[in-house]
Amino acid sequence: MPIMPITPKPIRRTAFFLSDRTGITVEMLGHSLLSQFENIPLDEITLPYIDSKAKATSAVRTINERYIADEARPLVFSTLVNPEIRLIINSADALHLDCFSIFIAPLEAELGARSSENMGRSHRVSDPTGYWKRINAINYALEHDDGLSQKNWNRADVTLVGASRTGKTPTCLYLALQYGIYAANYPLIPEDFQREELPAQIRNIRSKLFGFTIHPERLHEIRSERKPESVYASLKNCEYEVQSAEKLMRRAGIPYLDATSKSIEELATAVLHEAKLERKIY
């Protein structure tokens, strides 16, 4: 029998996300890039508010200590505006991916203008109107979660429907937080399946309805975490509810998608696209 070659185990690496403000932007960009290397084990560390030389020097020390511990160069993603702070971070024993300098220079050349070098502009409350739109959208999503409210359903930009525990609530909150979308959600339950018609609260807003479905096996896993050994969580009941919800949505002409293996971000993006909602990040 031939001896099969042993595939070396991937080395565990550390990824740092550095920012002079919240770190949200660099985390999103770094995660998007690293998701292309799913077989590489990673430890992730975010260091926000690196807005002074002293903090930058401390960050370099932390990065170098990790290099010694891992015996592998850390990966450093940064969105640092101050060139002096960037220079300090460049001295670290790491692969430094400076997300700002990569893009700012060609943008300055193309636009014929210097960048402002202001820190944290993308997450600053510079537009009170946009800020309050998000706050009001979040409050609306909470008030209209799981069919709780009995009024103002026609105010929703979109109302998500489907069996319970298919990802409707977190998607609504994400749409509200990121885009200021007024998103409600209404669970389809066995009583609706028996009547074979939509609940009265959402019957007159059919054009704003969008559905989620899910594989019964995955729904069984999710519900079992909350109510193990219950009829509600049983695989048989999950199969019944998923099939019945899909049948009801088809009958009502409601577009729907399979949420089984999609992230909240992917679900929200799909809803924006399919429901033709304005996509504006605040």
Swiss-Prot record:
Catalyzed reactions: [pyruvate, water dikinase] + ADP = [pyruvate, water dikinase]-phosphate + AMP + H(+); [pyruvate, water dikinase]-phosphate + phosphate + H(+) = [pyruvate, water dikinase] + diphosphate
Q: Which keywords belong to this entry?
A: Kinase, Nucleotide-binding, Serine/threonine-protein kinase, Transferase
Q: What class of enzyme is it?
A: transferase
Name the Gene Ontology molecular function terms of this record: ADP binding; ATP binding; phosphotransferase activity, phosphate group as acceptor; protein serine/threonine kinase activity
| Enzyme Commission number | 2.7.11.33, 2.7.4.28
The UniProt record gives the binding positions of ADP as: G162, A163, S164, R165, T166, G167, K168, T169
Which InterPro entries does the record match to this protein? Kinase-pyrophosphorylase, PSRP
What NCBIfam families does the annotation carry?
PRK05339.1 (NF003742)
Query: Which family, according to the similarity comment?
Result: Belongs to the pyruvate, phosphate/water dikinase regulatory protein family. PSRP subfamily.
Q: What does this protein do?
A: Bifunctional serine/threonine kinase and phosphorylase involved in the regulation of the phosphoenolpyruvate synthase (PEPS) by catalyzing its phosphorylation/dephosphorylation.
What name goes with this protein? Putative phosphoenolpyruvate synthase regulatory protein
**Organism of this sequence:** Nitrosospira multiformis (strain ATCC 25196 / NCIMB 11849 / C 71)
Organism lineage string:
Bacteria, Pseudomonadati, Pseudomonadota, Betaproteobacteria, Nitrosomonadales
